[in-house]
Amino acid sequence: IDDPQCTNVDINYVLKALNAAVTTNVTADDVTAVWSGLRPLVKSVSGEKISSRTADLSRRHKVSKSQSGVITIAGGKLTTYRKMAQDTVDQVLETLDTSARCKTKTLKLIGAENSSANLEDKTAMHLRDRFGSEAKILAEMIEQDLSLGEPLIAGLPYLRAEAVFAVQHEMARTLDDILSRRTRSRIINRRASVASARNVAELIAPYLGWSEQEINTQVLSYCNSCADEDHAALALQ
C-alpha cells in the first residue's frame, strides 16, 4: 500500500485490452513508462452485500462527521471534485449552523484558459495549452532568460522554464515533484527522465538552495525509485 508498483501482470493485462482494440500488435517492448496507484474507494455500508472485487465498489464519495466533530470526505474521483467540495462545505456550514451561496460556478481556476491572449508561435501556444492564464508568467521568465525556453528533457514537450515555475509557483520541493507531478516526464518516458535527472536537479538547485550533496541525493532517490518500477515489472516475468 505504501509503494504500489506496476507488475508484469498489470502490463500484460493492459496490453491485452489494448491489442483487442487496435490492429498493431503492441508488446512490452513498446512501453516507455508505467504508472500505478490506489483508488480511495468507500467500503459498502452496513447491510449491503460486500464484493471482493474492487471493480464492483462504488466510485461515489461520502461525507461523514465524527462524534468529536471532525468532518471527513472519502472516495470520489477527479471528475466529480466540485461536487465533492460542495458536499463537504455544505456539511461544514450545517455544522456551524450557517448558510451561504456557492460562488464557484463561474469562478475561473488558476491556469484556466485565457482565450484573449494573442499567441502565435509554437512555444507560446504550448504555454497557453499547459498553463492557460498563467502562461504570461512563463513567457516573461523566458524573455528574461532565453535558456529557459529550451527543452527540459530531449524528446519531451516540457521547457526548462516549467521546472523553475514549478518551484516558484507550484510548491515543487523535490526532483520527483518536477518529473513525476508538475510535468509528466516520468510517465511519458521514464528512461529519458532518468537520463536528464541531474540536469534538471542542477537547474532547480539554486532556487531551492540545494548543495552539491543534496543534488546527488535527489538524483539518486529519483533514479532508485524509477529502478524499483523496472524491477517490479520484471519480477513476475
Regions found by a protein language model. Give the residues of each.
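C-terminal accessory subdomains/tails of enzymes that are appended
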Residues: D2-Q237
